[in-house]
């Protein structure tokens, strides 16, 4: 499983997660990408003249974070990413709110989840996730949780409405309900402490983090000072010699945050 955290603060929505994938019983790999940006595009109706280019009515980048089955999460992620870039709407009829977009995603989620849970994976094939974005209809920042219970009943619920945060995954049961969660760093500290707690086997690896500002979700790498300086994006240390040794190689252009003041300076969050 995992721990994913969504919270609303400073006119933004933040998503964070660990990197651990549960492969089988007592078998883990800290290589999952659980926080990601998901571009979407909604096109105007097709023009009668097929040679005319389609106009884009709405577009942006949603944020997503996953918990649960690695197989289910991957299939949902791949399927949804493929179709969200070419949606179409009918003016006056189609719901182009963020809820409408999430209801479209929810249809794919149910279909894929049912098929995965029919296999030998059974209940272990269950996955849950959160999607956040700026609503095309209202320009408000909103977030929705996609979940499945033990009876394979699927739910779509808006979150970050009555509460400023939402915890998702097996790690949620270990969060101290009395924890003081005020700053962005407080949420990341909860995640870091759980990753460092070896008694919580389902949560581990490196922190992943992204922020939704206006209509754009940006994923950041994490700077860590531990046996040297590391610049993590999931399991990948992007500034390591492995990636930086050849002058002719492409390098990562991702931005990084230093949430725990590794170098004694203010963090980006």
Predicted regions span which residues?
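N-terminal nucleophile
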Residues: 1-269
């Amino acid at each position: 499983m995992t721990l994913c955290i969504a919270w609303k603060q400073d006119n933004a929505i933040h998503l964070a997660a660990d990197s651990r994938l549960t492969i089988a019983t007592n078998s883990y790999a800290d290589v999952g990408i659980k926080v990601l940006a998901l571009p979407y595009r909604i096109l105007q109706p097709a023009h009668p003249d097929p040679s005319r280019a389609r106009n884009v009515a709405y577009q942006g980048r949603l944020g997503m974070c996953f918990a649960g089955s690695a197989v289910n999460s991957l299939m949902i992620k791949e399927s949804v990413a493929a179709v969200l870039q070419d949606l179409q709407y009918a003016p006056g009829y189609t719901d182009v709110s963020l809820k409408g977009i999430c209801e479209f995603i929810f249809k794919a989620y149910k279909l894929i989840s049912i098929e995965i849970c029919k296999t030998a994976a059974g209940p272990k094939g269950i996955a849950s996730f959160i999607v956040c974005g700026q609503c095309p209809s209202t320009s408000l920042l909103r977030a929705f949780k996609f979940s499945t219970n033990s009876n394979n009943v699927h739910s779509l619920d808006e979150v970050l409405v009555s509460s400023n945060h939402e915890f998702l995954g097996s790690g949620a049961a270990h969060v101290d309900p009395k924890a003081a969660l005020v700053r962005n760093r407080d949420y990341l500290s909860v995640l870091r402490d759980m990753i460092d707690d070896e008694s919580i086997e389902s949560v581990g690896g490196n922190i992943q983090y992204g922020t939704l500002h206006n209509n754009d979700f940006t994923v950041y790498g994490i700077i860590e000072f531990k046996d040297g300086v590391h610049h993590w994006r999931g399991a990948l240390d992007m500034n390591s010699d492995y990636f930086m040794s050849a002058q002719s190689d492409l390098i990562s252009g991702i931005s990084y945050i230093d949430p725990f003041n590794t170098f004694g300076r203010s963090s980006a969050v």
